[in-house]
Amino acid sequence: MTFRTLDTADLAGKRALVRVDFNVPVDGGKVADDTRLKAALPTIRFLADKGAKVVLLAHFDRPKGKVVPEMSLAFVAEPLAALLGAPVAFVGDCVGPAAAEVVNGLADGGVALLENVRFHAGEEKNDAEFAKALAANGDVYVNDAFSAAHRAHASTEGLAKLLPAYPGVSMQRELEALDAALGNPKKPVIGIVGGSKVSTKLDLLNNLVAKLDRLAIGGGMANTFLFAQGHDVGGSLCEKDLADTAREIMEKAKAAGCELLLPVDVVVAKKVAPGVETAVRSLSEVQADDLILDAGPESAKRLLAAMDQSLTLIWNGPLGVFEVPPFDEATVSAAKHAASLAKSGKIVAVAGGGDTVAALNHAGVSADFTFVSTAGGAFLEWMEGKTLPGVAALES
């Protein structure tokens, strides 16, 4: 894939319409986690420094094409301005005369945040007329919201057809990192896929076993594979109806030469709660009332050794119920090991997905990974090998 890059664009005095992801967690009407605001800063600063008028487009929540006052983006302007160290004008609509007046009145290098694009039904329908109304406030289009790139909406896809289109700084970093992890990786490549259910990650598993040298499966989804192999998983989370599917994935991996790493021992308890009594069991020792809540120490040791033999790691999903210690041990040990390998340049380590980001933050190692994607659904679809409309629309 080839893209125009912002450093080649003539930006002075131009209105740059920038699609960002400000769909942030909220607590008591305030931004509870400003990660996504911070992710937009490099692009905003780059454009402002080049003398562009920076016009931010974003969605928040699911107003379903109607104005829902409690889903207004107004609350984002103040924390964004504080992070930016510059004023941010908020506009109560994203199209029409009110938006045009503020945008056209911006000084070069000034920043405006327009109202929630999803207040208009045309956004999610990718309506051509709505895209034109958005485009009326811009001379160039910049997409810095990789996390919304799996949606063919007016502000993520339609706009890119109407104005010269560029990836933003964060978007470009994301595309380069994902290409290094899956598109054109240094081999051998190991994947870690965790989380609770196989059913939500079928496309992902089928795509990865065809591309990776090794794939470690953890979390609740590993129980489905263990059950498919004939092991008793006690009262653990397990999609028993997907046993045949799990066996098909195992066969596919074998045919493709992808080594599957499943737990060989597990950490169990009678309930999920902090400080409960736990035990490490081999697979043959799991009891009827056991809940498997983490991979065991031998499984973790094998995973670390497999990482040592790899040059690229791609990670989506935790290995256990990391939110409730001590069921975080396998996830934390794997995360710390991957981070130390990445920091010393021995491996390219790319991770993504909401639970994964939370797990790496919990382990305190996010900063040492080569790249951590906060994109969620878009990251998952990229890993599944799907075309992302918002990315495809930027191709030059």
UniProtKB/Swiss-Prot annotation:
Q: What is its EC number?
A: 2.7.2.3
**Subcellular location(s) of the protein:** Cytoplasm
**GO biological process, any:** glycolytic process
Binding sites annotated in the UniProt record for substrate: 21-23, 36, 59-62, 118, 151
Q: What chemistry does it catalyse, as a reaction equation?
A: (2R)-3-phosphoglycerate + ATP = (2R)-3-phospho-glyceroyl phosphate + ADP
Q: Which UniProt keywords apply?
A: ATP-binding, Cytoplasm, Glycolysis, Kinase, Nucleotide-binding, Transferase
Task: Kindly list the positions annotated as binding ATP.
Answer: 201, 323, 353-356
- Pathway involvement? Carbohydrate degradation; glycolysis; pyruvate from D-glyceraldehyde 3-phosphate: step 2/5
List GO terms (cellular component aspect).
Answer: cytosol
GO molecular function list: ADP binding; ATP binding; phosphoglycerate kinase activity
Q: Can you state the subunit structure given in the record? A: Monomer.
**Pfam families of this UniProt entry?**
PGK
UniProt-recorded name of the protein: Phosphoglycerate kinase
- Membrane-spanning parts: none
The kind of enzyme this is, by top-level EC class, is transferase
Q: Which family does it belong to?
A: Belongs to the phosphoglycerate kinase family.
Asked if the Swiss-Prot or TrEMBL record annotates the protein with the keyword Kinase, the reply is yes
